[in-house]
Amino acid sequence: MSALQAVVTLLLCGQLLAVETGSEATADSCPKAPEIANSHVEYSVRYQCDKYYKLHAGNGVYTFNNKQWINKDIGQQLPECEEDDSCPEPPKIENGYVEYLVRYQCKPYYTLRTCGDGVYTFNSKKQWINKNIGQKLPECEAVCGKPKHPVDQVQRIIGGSLDAKGSFPWQAKMVSQHNLISGATLINERWLLTTAKNLYLGHSSDKKAKDITPTLRLYVGKNQLVEVEKVVLHPDHSKVDIGLIKLRQKVPVNDKVMPICLPSKDYVKVGRVGYVSGWGRNENFNFTEHLKYVMLPVADQDKCVKHYEGVDAPKNKTAKSPVGVQPILNENTFCVGLSKYQDDTCYGDAGSAFVVHDKEDDTWYAAGILSFDKSCAVAEYGVYVKVTSILDWVRKTIANN
């Protein structure tokens, strides 16, 4: 007959004895267990957490062995009690039942994208169901066009004002081959708009997009370097000076980094004012070390065309731009004039957005992307690609890539 193995577990013995006798519990409070033939006594203790706390690891049971307290799961390591965030069983009511609900909420600077309200009910089939979208889980998307510190006054990137508050969190700096600086505009967590000319800076016109990608360095927020995965040029970029940049990873959205919203209506009206930020050259023709911005008005397109091309010029005309370079002017572009302080954009600002504030929804939208940044307060107009004219291409490109 095999020997009988006995294990005696003493649970909270000291506490129980102290209650019964009214004396203070000590290490010797527990009496020795009676011995029986062909056995040995093994002592164990169980740690228990206070109400609303639970053990972080192990089952709390420790056996005394070779003068050491050992837990089978975590050895000599002592357990820890952490806050128990599980819901206790609710009390029952007469003629009623308990329905379990959960609500999904997004982190700051994110919002629910789906039409549901984030509330899910646990049904009899053990499924979490939302009344609007069923079993489909909600998605949190980045908030756009809601800077924590928006521009709140008319200030004066030729001269311009410093963006000390972070009013333009969608502004990115692009450094291309030969350390040439230009702008780019964040439009979601992973994509940016810039100009095709910017992407070709330092490259010959026959370069492929895949060859341009590894030469780019891109910075968002407070000089946060992000890795570029690919660039996509507009199929007609000789007439539509636009390209897209895809990042290898999504950027976390916060008060320093936030996309600008794409417009659902046309904000380009003569006289409408908007803001442009950038890292381009200043009044001394040096690249600025700090992000600057300027407020500029939408200009009359016909006057802008005449300014650059000359009145009644023949079709085979040569460029008459005051700066010796002809901008792209067509149905996909619009012109912006100088500020009342004669401030302007300049070399290096291209790719930045002309943003407008919609008071109805208190949101900022990208109305245009600066294409011609060579006016530098010498010419009267800067030229921008109209964002509404490229929306379909932008959406299809993002969806397919």
UniProtKB/Swiss-Prot annotation:
Task: Report domain Sushi positions.
Answer: 28-83, 85-142
Any one GO molecular function term: antioxidant activity
Segments carrying the region annotation (Interaction with CD163) are 313-318
The record, for Pfam families, names: Trypsin
Q: Does the keyword GTP-binding apply?
A: no
Q: How far does the signal peptide extend, from start to end residue? A: 1-18
Q: Which domain of life is it from?
A: Eukaryota
Q: What is its main location?
A: secreted
Query: A Gene Ontology CC term for this entry?
Result: blood microparticle
PROSITE patterns given in the database record: SUSHI, TRYPSIN_DOM
* Entry comment describing in which tissues the protein is expressed: Expressed by the liver and secreted in plasma.
Tell me where in this chain the Peptidase S1 domain is found: 157-399
User: Where located?
Assistant: Secreted, Extracellular space
Which controlled-vocabulary keywords does the entry list?
A: Acute phase, Antibiotic, Antimicrobial, Antioxidant, Disulfide bond, Glycoprotein, Hemoglobin-binding, Immunity, Repeat, Secreted, Serine protease homolog, Signal, Sushi
Q: List the disulfide bonds.
A: 49-81, 106-140, 144-261, 304-335, 346-376
Q: Name one GO biological process term.
A: immune system process
Q: How does it assemble?
A: Tetramer of two alpha and two beta chains; disulfide-linked. The hemoglobin/haptoglobin complex is composed of a haptoglobin dimer bound to two hemoglobin alpha-beta dimers. Interacts with CD163. Interacts with ERGIC3.
What is the role of the protein in this entry? As a result of hemolysis, hemoglobin is found to accumulate in the kidney and is secreted in the urine. Haptoglobin captures, and combines with free plasma hemoglobin to allow hepatic recycling of heme iron and to prevent kidney damage. Haptoglobin also acts as an antioxidant, has antibacterial activity and plays a role in modulating many aspects of the acute phase response. Hemoglobin/haptoglobin complexes are rapidly cleared by the macrophage CD163 scavenger receptor expressed on the surface of liver Kupfer cells through an endocytic lysosomal degradation pathway.
Q: Which family does it belong to?
A: Belongs to the peptidase S1 family.
Q: What is known of its domains?
A: The beta chain mediates most of the interactions with both subunits of hemoglobin, while the alpha chain forms the homodimeric interface.
What is the protein's given name?
A: Haptoglobin
Q: Which organism is it from?
A: Bos taurus (Bovine)
For this protein's source organism, the top of the classification is: Eukaryota, Metazoa, Chordata, Craniata, Vertebrata
Question: What gene does the UniProt entry assign to this protein?
Answer: HP
